[in-house]
Amino acid sequence: MVDFPSRFEVIVIGGGHAGTEAALASARMGVKTLLLTHNVETLGQMSCNPAIGGIGKSHLVKEIDALGGAMAMATDKGGIQFRVLNSRKGPAVRATRAQADRVLYKAAIRETLENQPNLWIFQQACDDLIVDQDQVRGVVTQMGMRIFADSVVLTTGTFLGGLIHIGMQNYSGGRAGDPPSIALAQRLRELPLRVGRLKTGTPPRIDGRSVDFSVMTEQPGDTPIPVMSFLGNKEQHPPQVSCWITHTNARTHEIIASNLDRSPMYSGVIEGIGPRYCPSIEDKIHRFADKESHQVFIEPEGLTTHELYPNGISTSLPFDVQLQIVRSIRGMENAHIVRPGYAIEYDYFDPRDLKYSLETKVIGGLFFAGQINGTTGYEEAGAQGLLAGTNAALRAQGRDSWCPRRDEAYIGVLVDDLITLGTQEPYRMFTSRAEYRLILREDNADLRLTEKGRELGLVDDARWAAFCIKRESIELEEQRLKSTWVRPGTEQGDAIAAHFGTPLTHEYNLLNLLTRPEIDYASLISITGQGCTDPQVAEQVEIKTKYAGYIDRQQDEIARLRASEDTRLPEDIDYAAISGLSKEIQSKLGITRPETLGQASRIPGVTPAAISLLMIHLKKRGAGRQLEQSA
């Protein structure tokens, strides 16, 4: 066995969305980092749909960006259609979504990786972990090379024991065209970690030259074109294109229903549970039998390819059935399938065996991020990767680990849900999962996280300077509005009354006027002739002013809960020894091993009375230790 000539502080296994963010985060913090990938050509590859963002997901992307991550900037460089979803609703649920050119997105990620100081890339599959006395010491590659490191971050995606299904045929694979990680999967199953199987799928890809777009509904992007990154601009965007909408029909549903016996999912061949919120077309037909049709979004895969992604017809049915399904859909009667759809089963590990840092509880220095933790989606993977990479670097630096709270970031919601509740199906982020979504908007992710990112070493000088200018501009504009008064009967007062249809009864400052629902910031500054032209600053001023009462109420609630939320539970606490706790609650607490009282309170079945007993126990334990020290 040969040793690699260099030792690293952090090794990241896997070059997908979790792995790239993990490696970049660690390296940005000044830690010597190795990114180990089975194929350098697939770094940052979009394995499924060619899109970034969406409801709940864009919040994660913006948080990654606020902490210096690459996903949003790569989206701005590769995005070929941008839309703001829920644009007519409140700011808490608005979400930016971008179609991405696969080639351009992947190229942007690779360029970022190759130009990141402290980061080395090496092409080799990982077959084994070096573990000594419950501490990870490094990895062993497929050619028997040992590489030593203080911490290892596993971001293996769907590759662990990956099994691809098309009809009744199945074969080993990490995704179509890539080998699975069999040796590593077997090694991980030897560790004292709970393991399960999940499933995901992808639709057949269609040749756009064989599609009749004239009978479909065009879906253009938004104008003006949104940007994804806080540092992004429209000039970075490549040429923009449209998506198209068509629908399944009674004939489509009949084809699927009559072939369910040939579906590996319905014949019992597939054991893994698939994503609830991204079901296969056969699952939709079975679960929603009363629906006459389902939308199919025809999404371009890029500017230099004819391939289309028919979002909404993910399937693992045999190829001949896939062809019938596709050709039964309006506009695709003569469609040519370039790549068949398939389902893939893979190993995942119960995230309740992780700490908030995403370090495993049983092996020191071993971190998990992405689909290995039971999540689905590029954005969820990227967020976990950034957090795991950050904490691996903090460990190397001898610093305390970090994870944002539920009231600080969607990343915090994601991790808390996973390590507290676990998951039996692929976990997807939604805004509805966050209790404090009015303060966790996508538009203020930088105001929530960039200062912390700077403290951790994740945010570079350029981003920090831009952020400081923005933050100061918001404060100055709020002060200007607060100190600018308008009186009834004056030229400005009459202009405001005429424009908004609201007569002024007495003197108002502009900040007071902006709280009114009928008055918007853009119109206000056009009348007064003064104001901020930076759209990000203007947006923050308007949202903070109009929703101030609701935001203050949420902040008060957070402050009340924070004391118990942050109270830490000792790692060696013996729940069986706490009198008054039921056997059921003792068992649940013993299995999850919550890190704080707040986390304990969110375990299903753990009652407020049980939390009170824990608080009493902690006070007694603290008093007992003080007596021991004074004796």
From Swiss-Prot:
Keywords attached to this entry? Cytoplasm, FAD, Flavoprotein, NAD, tRNA processing
Cofactor(s) the protein needs: FAD
Q: Where does the protein end up?
A: Cytoplasm
User: Which residues take part in binding FAD?
Assistant: 14-19
Provide the GO MF annotations for this entry: flavin adenine dinucleotide binding
Q: Where does NAD(+) bind?
A: 274-288
- A matching Pfam family: GIDA_C_1st
SMART domains in the record: GIDA_assoc_3
Highest taxon listed in the record's lineage: Bacteria
Gene3D superfamilies xref list: FAD/NAD(P)-binding domain, GidA associated domain, C-terminal subdomain, tRNA uridine 5-carboxymethylaminomethyl modification enzyme MnmG/GidA
Claim: Acetylation is one of the keywords in the record: no
| The keyword tRNA processing is assigned to this record | yes
Q: Can you cite an annotated GO cellular component?
A: cytosol
Q: List the disulfide bonds.
A: none
* GO BP annotations, alphabetical order: tRNA methylation; tRNA wobble uridine modification
Q: Which InterPro entries match?
A: FAD/NAD-bd_sf (IPR036188), GIDA_C_N (IPR049312), MnmG (IPR004416), MnmG-rel (IPR002218), MnmG-rel_CS (IPR020595), MnmG_C (IPR026904), MnmG_C_subdom (IPR047001), MnmG_C_subdom_sf (IPR044920)
Q: Tell me, how does this one assemble?
A: Homodimer. Heterotetramer of two MnmE and two MnmG subunits.
Entry-linked HAMAP family: MnmG_GidA
Primary role:
NAD-binding protein involved in the addition of a carboxymethylaminomethyl (cmnm) group at the wobble position (U34) of certain tRNAs, forming tRNA-cmnm(5)s(2)U34.
Q: What protein family is recorded?
A: Belongs to the MnmG family.
User: This chain belongs to which protein, by name?
Assistant: tRNA uridine 5-carboxymethylaminomethyl modification enzyme MnmG
Q: Which organism encodes this protein?
A: Pseudomonas syringae pv. syringae (strain B728a)
